[in-house]
Amino acid sequence: MKKKVIVGLSGGVDSSVAAYLLIQQGYEVEGLFMRNWDSSANNDILGNQEIDNDVCPQEQDYLDALEVANKLGIKLHRIDFVQEYWEYVFEYFIKEYKKGRTPNPDILCNKYIKFDKFLNHAINELKADYIAMGHYAGVRFNEKTKQYEMIRAVDTNKDQTYFLCQLTQNQLSKTLFPLQSLEKPEIRKIAAEQGLITADKKDSTGICFIGEREFTKFLQNYISNQPGDIVDIKTNEVLGKHIGAMYYTIGQRKGLNLGGMKEPYYVAAKDIDKKIIYVCPASDESYLLSNNAIVTEINWSLDLKQYIDNVEEFECTAKFRYRQPDVKVRLNKIKDNEYKVSYDAIVKAVTPGQEAVFYLNDICLGGGIIDIVE
């Protein structure tokens, strides 16, 4: 009897090809389209250039997913997770920005929506054996350790294990990633050969399930402006004004509106209570550099003791942001799911609220939230 897979059909090329490949591999395949954002209900007005479109982007994505499903000869289900996305992803996202931190909504969306709400619906209601997504990542079962290992994609530029670092053994055991061994041009080629409407569709960017927005204006829908000074961290000189320190992230250069300066300036630190953004010149980036970070709420995607001799103190590599080259790090355990992470390499703009994700060669071990940078 064929195993049943529910594919998260998003209306993009990656999930379209994932569905096609699984059909070719002999699975019984059905699609499930998620609607996670409602611009009207969620007051998504400022910064939304698509608000006056005749067909909203989410609805166009559904129509594209439906056309792909029809072309492949599979059933397409549809489900609404707008309320769940708001509660589990967006409220945290806004709360963190108000604190002056920079959260990663894509990681939260994977943790709480795609691999929780979606997975449970697929398994329990649609009676699937597995779910599948168009992510660039892989899962393999290690017979020796008896662990499901999440591994990097062959296309290193597209690898998305960073965003999947919160997945658990249970979730990995029920997930297929058909695109692990393919690069983007190959995927577009397969889509074109199969006559899929998504073959030339541009990749989605912006906030997970929300899309591209003028970011500061978008946040103004949910956070009130709190103007203050832009201060040179070295000289304490006031260089300009800002409309809200929470709108800026560590390492940011664009959008400071510091005219007449001899060189670019970067956001080096923020004081939310005093409404101050501290900046440093490009010629002195020492204020952006760090050697240690405290990482909290770490999720280990596998049983770490099967891979690391001493889990109290060990070395591996890490990424502190998406597409950053791996950095060699030393981890010292503070308490359960909290480690001090030290690195000798010069790492710029490690940012509180973002995720630190840990690797052992091609295996993603898991990740946690950067809480304090030293």
Curated annotation (Swiss-Prot):
EC number: 2.8.1.13
Active-site feature positions: C109 (nucleophile), C208 (cysteine persulfide intermediate)
Annotated site (Interaction with tRNA): H135, Q354
Matching InterPro entries: MnmA-like (IPR004506), MnmA-like_C (IPR046885), MnmA-like_central (IPR046884), MnmA-like_central_sf (IPR023382), Rossmann-like_a/b/a_fold (IPR014729)
Enzymatic reactions: S-sulfanyl-L-cysteinyl-[protein] + uridine(34) in tRNA + AH2 + ATP = 2-thiouridine(34) in tRNA + L-cysteinyl-[protein] + A + AMP + diphosphate + H(+)
Annotated region described as Interaction with tRNA, given as residue ranges: 158-160, 321-322
Family: Belongs to the MnmA/TRMU family.
Name used for this protein in its record: tRNA-specific 2-thiouridylase MnmA
UniProt source species: Mesoplasma florum (strain ATCC 33453 / NBRC 100688 / NCTC 11704 / L1)
Name of the gene: mnmA
